[in-house]
Every structure is written in C-alpha cells, then in structure tokens.
Swiss-Prot record:
Expressed by the venom gland. The keyword Signal applies. The modification Leucine amide is found at L36. This is Antimicrobial peptide Eval655. Its main location: secreted. The keyword Ligase does not apply. Keywords: Amidation, Antimicrobial, Cleavage on pair of basic residues, Secreted, Signal. The lineage of its organism: Eukaryota, Metazoa, Ecdysozoa, Arthropoda, Chelicerata. It comes from the Eukaryota. Belongs to the non-disulfide-bridged peptide (NDBP) superfamily. Short antimicrobial peptide (group 4) family.
Amino acid sequence: MKTQFVVLLVALVLLQMFAQSEAIWGALLSGVADLLGKRGLKNLDDFDDIFDDDLSSADLEFLKQLMR
C-alpha cells in the first residue's frame, strides 16, 4: 500500500512538472514567433505618446468634446 502511494505521488509530481514546462515552452515559442513575425520587428509601444506634455489647441478641443 505504501509503495502504491509513493508511485502515485511521484506520478503526480512528474505530471505537474510536465504540464508546467509545457506552458513555459509554449510561451517562449509564441514570444519568438511574435519577434520573427511581420509586426514583431516594429516598435509598437504606444505608451510613449501618453506622456506628451505639449497639447495643441486641436487636442484640447477634442478633449473638450470627449468630456461632454
């Protein structure tokens, strides 16, 4: 009975390790695929424009229309 329990625990640990490593490898492979894709080499960081401190009058008018 003890041997069966130990075999069950070892099997569960190995299965859990396999499941987690598969998720890690999947995430790494999708990241590499994104880098090598058509849009992967472009800088798609849109957060640089958020901190623009100079606003034109057209920008202010657009913001006023949004806040109505």
